[in-house]
Amino acid sequence: MAKENFNRSKPHLNIGTIGHVDHGKTTLTAAITKVLSDAGYCQAKSFDQIDNAPEEKERGITINTSHVEYETANRHYAHVDCPGHADYVKNMVTGAAQMDGAILVVAATDGPMPQTREHILLGRQVGIPRIVVFMNKVDMVDDAELLELVEMEIRDLLSFYEYDGDNGPVVQGSALGGLNNDPNWVPKIIELMEAVDNWIEEPVRDVAKPFLMPVEDVFTITGRGTVATGRIETGVANTGDPVEIIGMGAEKLTSTITGVEMFRKILDRGEAGDNVGLLLRGIDKADIKRGMVIIKPGSVKPHAKFKAEVYILKKEEGGRHTPFHNNYRPQFYVRTTDVTGVISLPAGVEMVMPGDNLTIEVALLSPIAMNVGLRFAIREGGRTVGAGQVTEIVE
């Protein structure tokens, strides 16, 4: 079968393998590409190609991640696999690889292990909506009752973290068998991908969400008015749309878009991902500054207090050399600007060591446009010391 070109007519989803070290995440990733390439949908990637993950920098943090792409009959997937546990934590907390769903790999020989639990918890915290389970190494377990027990244990764990443990698919197979073309195990890889196709839902694309653009720069065009530039984060900006400008001390300014410019051309509209200049009616250059956010009226509110899941960099990663304590006051770099905030640690936590990940509460000195899932870096004197995302808005 001839290799197809990248086909944009298929819906695109981002997924990844998660689970305990040595349970077979990378072998499974290789097996998926092997089985789907035999079906003519993608190029196979070997274990070594995937395991040898390149370093990437995301919000000042170095993460090793492997990106693989493949297609099923119905969808196109970008799949992320990380070599080390710390890379997973960093990847999920910083959102370096946003996941629309995940494949949880659990070795039947071990059952759920500490990192299995930790990855499910992180998935819940950072909003991975659905999880499909692949029970691996089933060929190494002779006892059918044991397999049943392991599956029950996994389902209980998913339910505990508010996933649908009762109804979610659990596929029992062997990643190595699938990779080695074993006729007993190849169908299980196909069954897994059918489960992924059916269970993991297509996400609402950014364009379909309400309009939001963080302001990067502001200038005046003589005779035409004030222009705010930035990259549209979500939604669409049309000429004639009413907007609000909020955050960083803006007292809910309202305006109307009188023009959208991109690459020095006038357009009717700009959409998520575009770098644009918006011409704003009745707004003075002095009214608006970097760090404010232009939104569809009423869609987002400014907030100053929130809870967040964060990862604190190790010394070797360029982070702090010493722990920090309650009431630590770093800067939070959100979208386009730094805001100072005060960190409150959870009860019973005296201090936070470099390399930790935990839930904190933050009080910012000035409110900013905020929603659950908003990502940020924690900085001190211009260097990144941590990263995270908002899990709950307090006020």
From Swiss-Prot:
Identification of the protein by name: Elongation factor Tu
Organism of this sequence: Flavobacterium johnsoniae (strain ATCC 17061 / DSM 2064 / JCM 8514 / BCRC 14874 / CCUG 350202 / NBRC 14942 / NCIMB 11054 / UW101) (Cytophaga johnsonae)
All copies of domain tr-type G, residue ranges: 10-204
Region: G4, residue numbers: 136-139
Residue segments, region G5: 174-176
UniProt signal peptide: none
GO molecular function, one term: translation elongation factor activity
GTP-binding listed as a keyword: yes
Stretches for region G3: 81-84
Gene assigned in the entry: tuf
EC class: hydrolase
G1: annotated span: 19-26
Function: GTP hydrolase that promotes the GTP-dependent binding of aminoacyl-tRNA to the A-site of ribosomes during protein biosynthesis.
Record-stated family: Belongs to the TRAFAC class translation factor GTPase superfamily. Classic translation factor GTPase family. EF-Tu/EF-1A subfamily.
Subcellular localization(s) per the UniProt record: Cytoplasm
HAMAP family in the cross-refs: EF_Tu_B
Binding site for GTP: 19-26, 81-85, 136-139
Catalysis: reaction(s): GTP + H2O = GDP + phosphate + H(+)
Subunit structure: Monomer.
Keyword Cytoplasm carried by entry: yes
Binding-site positions, Mg(2+): T26
GO cellular component: cytosol
Enzyme Commission number(s) of this protein: 3.6.5.3
Principal subcellular localization: cytoplasm
UniProt entry keywords in alphabetical sequence: Cytoplasm, Elongation factor, GTP-binding, Hydrolase, Magnesium, Metal-binding, Nucleotide-binding, Protein biosynthesis
